[in-house]
Amino acid sequence: MEGKEEDVNVGANKFPERQPIGTAAQTESKDYKEPPPAPFFEPGELKSWSFYRAGIAEFIATFLFLYVTVLTVMGVKRAPNMCASVGIQGIAWAFGGMIFALVYCTAGISGGHINPAVTFGLFLARKLSLTRALFYIVMQCLGAICGAGVVKGFQPGLYQTNGGGANVVAHGYTKGSGLGAEIVGTFVLVYTVFSATDAKRSARDSHVPILAPLPIGFAVFLVHLATIPITGTGINPARSLGAAIIYNKDHAWDDHWIFWVGPFIGAALAALYHQIVIRAIPFKSKT
Amino acid sequence: MSKEVSEEGKTHHGKDYVDPPPAPLLDMGELKSWSFYRALIAEFIATLLFLYVTVATVIGHKKQTGPCDGVGLLGIAWAFGGMIFVLVYCTAGISGGHINPAVTFGLFLARKVSLVRALGYMIAQCLGAICGVGFVKAFMKTPYNTLGGGANTVADGYSKGTALGAEIIGTFVLVYTVFSATDPKRSARDSHIPVLAPLPIGFAVFMVHLATIPITGTGINPARSFGAAVIYNNEKAWDDQWIFWVGPFLGALAAAAYHQYILRASAIKALGSFRSNATN
């Protein structure tokens, strides 16, 4: 279309770009601005209340997330049979629905990460500084430990005998399968986060951010449906760490590396895919 | 274009949308544009993720050892519908978020995409589907092979004709929803906020799965059926494969005709029969 500003100014793009018709909106001009990359290290943040407020928000969100989800898992495990509980699908809904609610609540405070893998992916895309990324990850892990701790406090005996909601590779699957499932699952989640928070996306939604959390929550729900039989679904290192620390059994720790390596690789791949292939940011001319 | 838009606004007070011009049948210029290849990559990745999550959910469910141990058929339907919602949301601005050769075919018939783009999308979708199911087989090899490979087949007790009919009507529901969600007039009514376009599309997929999982496992997406058949490579899956191409394409054709000729009355508009102003 005439006059439409091109995303990529490279030699191959000599022809005007046609707007792909499908579910795309027909925008005539660019009414969004790509935010500048965040500085790598920003000591000034440490003196701002909003920095600590964001960390506290991540702590509380992850605490509530682990409390609701692990308690749901415990309810399913202790039931006499699966039909008497909310079942595997109910567990998936607990994870996905809780992410939807919490991302909605904390999006404006901290960006609503609730997941070290999401924080890592956004850090790689230079959406936040190293200082903030590390602070968020620490607060998320602490929140997860406290959330799982409260669940154990409610029912210490049942908690220990029913697996503690910890992530382990299930019988019949190799560690390689578990790792692969975590990588692809986290890719789905972080890629959805990138799409939902993209500046261009906001412009297309006429800057109405009401539904960004919904696809993120759905992505978590869907990945849980797919991989609960394999690993109980980590795709969130804080969630896996919180349950592992409070449960504290050998087999939970044996597999624990999978739930950090897998999610971080998946997040890195999603960051690469979105920033380089979809948005082609490194190839844009600096205007 | 901007001049044309403002002119249109002047002469047609009250109508604040413009129907896009029909896409050219052959547009070789697209082949030299990065956004074309980016769209293909996006369709490939989206279909890969779609097949991985959905087929893994199917295999995980079938692996259950007792009643209610899996996510249930409802969970499988959610996996399909929810994944379409998420992926259409993510790729809408890149490629239009088709993730389904039947949707691409319907939009091609409605002249929303060129032939070159339509063929490119379909190939990317089929390749993505094969890779997605390949991931599932790699991660859960033994249960994948013993539990039907997530392939679409006609269930016992149903004839091929019944299955074909189910696929036709199911795909009609999906493609008709896609047309409604992407209609420029619809956008105008929604104040041009396309926030919810992916949601009804995802729900349409979800509800069709609720209805037809017992009949065929629900194809309504030739790439999905093709990917599972290729990786599972079982005779029965191939015997029935034609149903999962003919049915969806007929359904898409019916939806395109219904939306374009009856709801939007584009043929009648072209004739100018009902209005003196030929530019309407």
Curated annotation (Swiss-Prot), chain A:
Residues 77-92, 155-175, 231-257 are extracellular. Keywords: Acetylation, Cell membrane, Membrane, Phosphoprotein, Repeat, Transmembrane, Transmembrane helix, Transport. One of its GO terms (molecular function) is water channel activity. It is a multi-pass membrane protein. A motif (NPA 1) lies at residues 115-117. The modification N-acetylmethionine is found at M1. The keyword Membrane applies. The modification Phosphoserine is found at S285. It is found in: Cell membrane. This is Probable aquaporin PIP1-5. It comes from Arabidopsis thaliana (Mouse-ear cress).
Curated annotation (Swiss-Prot), chain B:
It is found in: Cell membrane. It is a multi-pass membrane protein. This is Aquaporin PIP2-7. The modification N-acetylmethionine is found at M1. The chain crosses the membrane at residues 39-59, 70-90, 119-139, 161-181, 193-213, 243-263. A motif (NPA 2) lies at residues 221-223. Residues 1-38, 91-118, 182-192, 264-280 are cytoplasmic. Aquaporins contain two tandem repeats each containing three membrane-spanning domains and a pore-forming loop with the signature motif Asn-Pro-Ala (NPA). GO terms for cellular component: plasma membrane; plasmodesma; vacuole. It comes from Arabidopsis thaliana. Its main location: membrane. The keyword Transmembrane applies. Interacts with SYP61 and SYP121 in trafficking vesicles and at the plasma membrane. Water channel required to facilitate the transport of water across cell membrane. May be involved in the osmoregulation in plants under high osmotic stress such as under a high salt condition. Residues 60-69, 140-160, 214-242 are extracellular. A motif (NPA 1) lies at residues 100-102. It holds the Pfam family MIP. Keywords: Acetylation, Cell membrane, Membrane, Methylation, Phosphoprotein, Repeat, Transmembrane, Transmembrane helix, Transport. Belongs to the MIP/aquaporin (TC 1.A.8) family. PIP (TC 1.A.8.11) subfamily. The modification Phosphoserine is found at S273, S276. NCBIfam families: MIP. The modification N6,N6-dimethyllysine is found at K3. It comes from the Eukaryota. One of its GO terms (molecular function) is water channel activity. Induction: By NaCl and abscisic acid (ABA) treatments. The gene is PIP2-7. InterPro entries: Aquaporin-like, Aquaporin_transptr, MIP, MIP_CS.
